[in-house]
């Protein structure tokens, strides 16, 4: 029992999204990150799927609540409602499909309009293991990321390459913004929550108490 309680202890909770066209491997990325194995029987997500994991980011324990959204157009109205209050997102395309790459601008627009004002985004070129079938070069995607102020990695849900790093980089940047004061977990819709009431109290400015009549020497 004590071990379970310890495993659920965390300093912050971040709401994450995984977005992009259908067939890009979003569900497989989520499964690889949480279970450390490839989900080879994955079907297209219908609506939204959910997963969570606690990670250690620079000595802070962060619980990621991750919403894997359907990529088909007919589910867009449903999945858009889950954007609200997201602190971070993986924007996923398939390196073997230019169609999924060309759709990135629409996904990016949705994320920045509907999610948290300061949402942190990382671009993930998935299916890196299929390099021989590549339709989108690393350089082209890297330029897109730079132009749109995104972090960028190529990933493989099959081999696990860069999967954990993608989530870690995104979480690390959010944590850095909290520590610098750029992000305020107290702000409604930030997609961030304190995981411990004591930590929240420590990070809140201490109120100056007025001296009592006995202390003031009146």
UniProtKB/Swiss-Prot annotation:
UniProt modified residues of type Phosphoserine: 190, 204
5-glutamyl serotonin: residues carrying this PTM: 72
Binding positions for Mg(2+) per the UniProt entry: 27, 45, 68
Membrane topology, as annotated: Peripheral membrane protein
Pfam families: Ras
InterPro entries: P-loop_NTPase, Rab4, Rab_GTPases_membrane_traffic, Small_GTP-bd, Small_GTPase
Any one Gene Ontology cellular component term annotated for this protein: recycling endosome
Summary of activators and inhibitors of this protein: Regulated by guanine nucleotide exchange factors (GEFs) which promote the exchange of bound GDP for free GTP. Regulated by GTPase activating proteins (GAPs) which increase the GTP hydrolysis activity. Inhibited by GDP dissociation inhibitors (GDIs).
Residues annotated as binding GTP: 23-28, 42, 44-45, 71, 126-127, 129, 157-158
EC number, as in UniProt: 3.6.5.2
Chain positions of motif Switch 1: 44-49
Catalytic activity: GTP + H2O = GDP + phosphate + H(+)
Tissue expression notes: Expressed in the central nervous system, including cortex, cerebellum, midbrain and spinal cord, and in the kidney, lung, liver and spleen.
GO molecular function, one term: GDP binding
Modified how: Serotonylation of Gln-72 by TGM2 during activation and aggregation of platelets leads to constitutive activation of GTPase activity.
Main location per the UniProt record: membrane
PANTHER family given in the database record: DRAB11-RELATED (PTHR47979)
Domains (record comment): Switch 1, switch 2 and the interswitch regions are characteristic of Rab GTPases and mediate the interactions with Rab downstream effectors. The switch regions undergo conformational changes upon nucleotide binding which drives interaction with specific sets of effector proteins, with most effectors only binding to GTP-bound Rab.
Role description: The small GTPases Rab are key regulators of intracellular membrane trafficking, from the formation of transport vesicles to their fusion with membranes. Rabs cycle between an inactive GDP-bound form and an active GTP-bound form that is able to recruit to membranes different sets of downstream effectors directly responsible for vesicle formation, movement, tethering and fusion. RAB4A is involved in protein transport. Also plays a role in vesicular traffic. Mediates VEGFR2 endosomal trafficking to enhance VEGFR2 signaling.
Record-given protein name: Ras-related protein Rab-4A
Organism: Mus musculus (Mouse)
Source taxonomy: Eukaryota, Metazoa, Chordata, Craniata, Vertebrata
Gene designation per UniProt: Rab4a
């Amino acid at each position: 029992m004590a071990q379970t309680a310890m495993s659920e202890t965390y300093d912050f909770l971040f709401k994450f999204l995984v977005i992009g066209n259908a067939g890009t491997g979003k569900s497989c990325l989520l499964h690889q990150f949480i279970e450390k194995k490839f989900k080879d029987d994955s079907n297209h997500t219908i609506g939204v799927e959910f997963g969570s994991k606690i990670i250690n980011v620079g000595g802070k324990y962060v619980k990621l609540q991750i919403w894997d959204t359907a990529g088909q157009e007919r589910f867009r109205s449903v999945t858009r409602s889950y954007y609200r209050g997201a602190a971070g997102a993986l924007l996923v395309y398939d390196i073997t499909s230019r169609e999924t790459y060309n759709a990135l601008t629409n996904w990016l627009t949705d994320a920045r309009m509907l999610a948290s004002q300061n949402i942190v985004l990382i671009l993930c070129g998935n299916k890196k293991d299929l390099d021989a079938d590549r339709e989108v070069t690393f350089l082209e995607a890297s330029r897109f990321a730079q132009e749109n102020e995104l972090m960028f990695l190529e990933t493989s849900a099959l081999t696990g390459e860069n999967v954990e790093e993608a989530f870690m980089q995104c979480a690390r940047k959010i944590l850095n913004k909290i520590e610098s004061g750029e992000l305020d977990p107290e702000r409604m819709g930030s997609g961030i929550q304190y995981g411990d009431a004591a930590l929240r109290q420590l990070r809140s400015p201490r109120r100056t108490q007025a001296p009592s009549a006995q202390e003031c020497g009146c």
